[in-house]
């Protein structure tokens, strides 16, 4: 494999926002939708073009983004801060790279309305149910059963919301309950659901382990997985806390994966190794090889090691950078009738120098034999943010996730700050900017 997942043309060879410009002439927007579209759609178009999605797929996915997401990002400028990003932005674009496979572009977002965070909808429930109805109409393979079930089990209802009286997740600024993820694959769209159970734990006085056990047990016979193994380890290692969350595929329950996410401030290799191996319980060749490659990536991106000061507050330019530190995140992916979970790590690169991170990734790609991707990657990421200097910024690359199996090899995703709005003052003395959208 020499060309690598990105193909052989650089993004400078084409007009990477051509589809965005064309659609902008004909789509109709409210004032809020217009703001979100022009601040986010150009970047999505650039990412799709860089990942070699042909022009027809670019049109398809940008129209989907307009129809399913832009109308549900809430007021612009935003008022409700979403838990899905460190800045509180309710949308996040990422790209997944695998051996011998085209890159896959993904969209994560939390549906928001003008009521989100107000007394009428303090925990942002109403918009999610509307999006479920929309997806049921426009996505033939979308199955809402697990979304509806887990939201009922793991998020607060109206009575519980009233009891909480607008309180945040313990010690934080967070209130989010649900979110969605979209994988843009081969002309289709795979949908994932997310739930953030902290408020449910808070009001019910149940532990997260208790809530998850009850939810999983309620699906026995149609959604069987090795939850007990993960639950025991998460309890023992302190993996559960108020920032933990879960996700699942919005497909027939018997075919869905279930992921349990942990969040921790101990960003050290010793902790990573313990989590990756379930405290030494997982020792297969697959686990050992994955850990070896994970250590290589850890070394190349040169992540600052140590105890982080993350408390659940947003890094949104209202704090003079005091909340820039991000925690380590990981998940255990549970598949039906599979006795062992698959670990995935999310390195917290928000707050690290962007050029250092991008160059480290390029070296990792080079070591995998993804030559063209490695050669063009710094230029490609720079083209995503033409108004920014990656040598000076610290928040344009947000997360790097990594998993490994013998079947698929390296499974790596890069998550980006996904708006032309730049909230922060950089070390170069830039003023808080609004970007030009394209």
UniProtKB/Swiss-Prot annotation:
GO BP terms: alkaloid metabolic process
Catalyses: (S)-3-(indol-3-ylmethyl)-6,7,8,8a-tetrahydropyrrolo[1,2-a]pyrazin-1-one + dimethylallyl diphosphate = (S)-3-{[2-(1,1-dimethylallyl)-indol-3-yl]methyl}-6,7,8,8a-tetrahydropyrrolo[1,2-a]pyrazin-1-one + diphosphate; 1-hydroxy-3-(indol-3-ylmethyl)-6H,7H,8H-5lambda(5)-pyrrolo[1,2-a]pyrazine + dimethylallyl diphosphate = 1-hydroxy-3-{[2-(1,1-dimethylallyl)-indol-3-yl]methyl}-6H,7H,8H-5lambda(5)-pyrrolo[1,2-a]pyrazine + diphosphate
What does this chain do?
Answer: Prenyltransferase; part of the gene cluster that mediates the biosynthesis of malbrancheamide, a dichlorinated fungal indole alkaloid that belongs to a family of natural products containing a characteristic bicyclo[2.2.2]diazaoctane core. The first step of malbrancheamide biosynthesis involves coupling of L-proline and L-tryptophan by malG, a bimodular NRPS, to produce L-Pro-L-Trp aldehyde through reductive offloading.
**What domain of life does the UniProt record list for this protein's source?**
Eukaryota
Q: Which family does it belong to?
A: Belongs to the tryptophan dimethylallyltransferase family.
Q: Which UniProt keywords apply?
A: Prenyltransferase, Transferase
Spell out the protein name for this chain. Answer: Prenyltransferase malE
Respond yes or no to whether keyword Transferase is given for this record.
Answer: yes
Positions bound to dimethylallyl diphosphate: 106, 192, 194, 259, 261, 346, 411
Practical applications: Malbrancheamides have the ability to inhibit calmodulin, calmodulin-dependent phosphodiesterase (PDE1), and induce both endothelium-independent and endothelium-dependent relaxant effects, suggesting their potential as vasorelaxant agents.
EC number(s) on file: 2.5.1.-
Residues the entry annotates as binding substrate = 92
Q: Which CDD domains match?
A: PT-DMATS_CymD (cd13929)
Instruction: Give the pathway listed in the UniProt entry for this protein.
Output: Alkaloid biosynthesis
Molecular function terms in GO for this entry? Answer: prenyltransferase activity
Identify which top EC class this enzyme belongs to.
Answer: transferase
What would be one Pfam family of this protein? Answer: Trp_DMAT
